[in-house]
Swiss-Prot record:
Modification sites for ADP-ribosyl aspartic acid: D138
Modified residues (N6-(ADP-ribosyl)lysine): K6
Residue positions of motif Nuclear localization signal: 14-18
Annotated function: Mono-ADP-ribosyltransferase that mediates mono-ADP-ribosylation of target proteins and plays a key role in the response to DNA damage. Mediates mono-ADP-ribosylation of glutamate, aspartate or lysine residues on target proteins. In contrast to PARP1 and PARP2, it is not able to mediate poly-ADP-ribosylation. Involved in DNA repair by mediating mono-ADP-ribosylation of a limited number of acceptor proteins involved in chromatin architecture and in DNA metabolism, such as histone H2B, XRCC5 and XRCC6.
Pfam families according to UniProt: PARP, PARP_reg, WGR
Protein name: Protein mono-ADP-ribosyltransferase PARP3
Subunit structure of this chain's protein: Interacts with PARP1; leading to activate PARP1 in absence of DNA. Interacts with PRKDC. Interacts with XRCC5/Ku80; the interaction is dependent on nucleic acids. Interacts with XRCC6/Ku70; the interaction is dependent on nucleic acids. Interacts with EZH2, HDAC1, HDAC2, SUZ12, YY1, LRIG3 and LIG4.
UniProt main location, coarse: nucleus
Disruption phenotype: No visible phenotype in normal conditions, but mutant mice are sensitive to ionizing radiation. In B-cells, class switch recombination is increased, while somatic hypermutation is unaffected, due to increased occupancy of Aicda/Aid at the donor switch region.
Family note: Belongs to the ARTD/PARP family.
Length: 533
């Protein structure tokens, strides 16, 4: 084997230490976090399909607003019902709209001159559809063959302020505020625009058959997503331990589609009746939770702008919300060239991704957490592909243990030494006539490797005495061409050669190697790549 060539690269770790390295399964820990989250503040809007929605004098009375949903796979039901009590001066209206999920549906407007009469009409309709009292909605209990209350949240007022801030000068009463010029370079400005794009989030939801009309961005609450996790947990338990007297998978699937509305058009909603379908819905909810996280970041209140003369540019504000330093690399730097070679040599041989930009990543607190493994050797720079909709969440929260209960190598964080393997997990967005995607390169402290050549989805940790699990593939980048980058004083192997056959693993069930760690702290994100596919 040729000696490894070294290139020295130094990065600064964060000075804030994050305590603890115990990792939990992401699915259950995410569900618990959502359940424990405080209720979101609601800003209630008039239903956009209501003819009064463009009348600024019409508003929803107090919190008399509800979105109901009902899915029954056996009867091919997948329907919604919206009720709002509207007011304008001394006039009151009870607005009802209903239909199949994904369609505008039918509507009805009742007029009242007495508020109490309007309230009675609202409460009566709520009772008819749910068999729950409006006054007891905080203790809502879903009833058979009735609608379920869906918790949604109006678009935050602060978001409107952010949009308005796009203009060079903003006046708020007698106080004049000026938006500062953006401090980010053009490539990073475009990155921040993309990973916080509402249109991108909506497209990601549409690809998952989620009803973006029922759950437009900014409206889905943490508590509602948590109910989706609970419904999937019930489905998983029913698959593992079927009983004759329990709910059927079809009934439990209907419960899931009721709390997380899906748009299937006029087609019958498909039952969640296999581990593969269940896993797809788990992954979907994790993406949904990450979308909610990105939206929560943007909706978080900043300083009161009316008290200052200058406000940050919206892109600077979003960048600061990530709590992550992104440094754009010049294409002439040694790091960039090494990454470019790594991509070209291990990318798809028919259509290799086109590298556009590379950012050095320094997540707040991650350097200190990674330091816990400073004595663990055998470090490699490895690929991780992802959905563009979760890039902001990853930059904020890092890579987390994914619930691969049906995964080939168990519950861990998956990496690859060949770009073409990880690129298969990249979901892109359309931007400027191109399909734009993002990939991460992480420094992974592998330590002592345990090799496998057949699937083992039961793995939750390496065997005793080992630090990682490698599903050895039939090919691997030519180790004779590996180089080393020095990152924070540690040598990190970076493949530079094309994939070659591995005679020792020619019978492996894995065509390409997969690298698994089971502690989130064993990885540090080092680079973010923008690619065109």
């Amino acid at each position: 084997m040729a000696p490894k060539r070294k290139a020295s690269v130094q990065t600064e770790g964060s000075k804030k230490r994050r305590q603890g390295t115990e990792e939990e399964d992401s699915f259950r820990s995410t569900a618990e976090a959502l359940r424990a989250a405080p209720a979101d503040n609601r800003v209630i809007r008039v239903d956009p399909s209501c003819p009064f929605s463009r009348n600024p004098g019409i508003q929803v009375h107090e919190d008399y607003d509800c979105t109901l949903n009902q899915t029954n796979i056996g009867n091919n039901n997948n329907k919604f019902y919206i009720i709002q009590l509207l007011e304008e001066g001394s006039r009151f209206f009870c607005w009802n709209r209903w239909g199949r999920v994904g369609e505008v549906g039918q509507s009805k407007m009742n007029h009242f001159t007495c508020l109490e009469d309007a309230k009675k009409d609202f409460k009566k309709k709520f009772w008819e559809k749910t068999k729950n009292k409006w006054e007891e909605r905080d203790r809502f209990v879903a009833q058979p063959n009735k609608y379920t209350l869906i918790e949604v949240q109006g678009e935050a007022e602060s978001q409107e302020a952010v949009v308005k801030a796009l203009s060079p000068q903003v006046y708020s009463g007698p106080v004049r505020t000026v938006v500062k010029p953006c401090s980010l370079d053009p490539a990073t400005q475009n990155l921040i625009t993309n990973i916080f794009s509402k249109e991108m989030f909506k497209n990601a939801m549409t690809l998952m058959n989620l009803d973006v009309k029922k759950m437009p961005l900014g409206k889905l609450t943490k508590q509602q997503i948590a109910r989706g996790f609970e419904a999937l947990e019930a489905l998983e338990e029913a698959m593992k331990n079927p009983t004759g007297d329990g709910q059927s998978l079809e009934e439990l699937s209907s419960c899931f589609y009721t709390v997380i509305p899906h748009n299937f058009g006029r087609s019958r909603p498909p039952p969640i009746n296999s581990p593969d379908v269940l896993q797809a819905k788990k992954d979907m909810l994790l993406v949904l939770a990450d979308i909610e996280l990105a939206q929560t970041l943007q909706a978080a209140p900043g300083e009161e702008e009316e008290k200052v003369e200058e406000v940050p540019h919206p892109l600077d504000r979003d960048y600061q919300l990530l709590r992550c330093q992104l440094q754009l690399l010049d294409s002439g730097e040694s790091e960039y060239k090494a990454i470019q070679t790594y991509l070209k040599q291990t990318g798809n041989s028919y259509r290799c991704p086109d590298l556009r930009h590379v950012w050095k990543v320094n997540r707040e607190g991650e350097g200190d957490r990674f330091q816990a493994h400073s004595k663990l050797g055998n470090r490699r720079l490895l690929w991780h592909g992802t959905n563009v909709a979760v890039v902001a969440a990853i930059l904020t929260s890092g890579l987390r243990i994914m619930p691969h209960s049906g995964g080939r190598v168990g519950k861990g964080i998956y990496f690859a030494s060949e770009n073409s393997k990880s690129a298969g997990y990249v979901t892109t967005m359309h931007c400027g006539g191109h399909q734009v995607g993002y990939m991460f390169l992480g420094e992974v402290a592998l330590g002592k490797e345990h090799h496998i050549t057949i699937d083992d989805p039961s793995l939750k940790s390496p065997p005793s005495g080992f630090d990682s699990v490698i599903a050895r593939g039939q090919t691997e980048p030519d180790p004779a061409q590996d180089i080393e980058l020095e990152l924070d004083g540690q040598p990190v192997v970076v493949p530079q050669g094309p994939p070659v056959q591995c005679p020792s693993f020619k019978s492996s069930s894995f065509s390409q190697s997969e690298y698994l760690i089971y502690k989130e702290s064993q990885c540090r994100l080092r680079y973010l790549l923008e690619i065109h596919l």
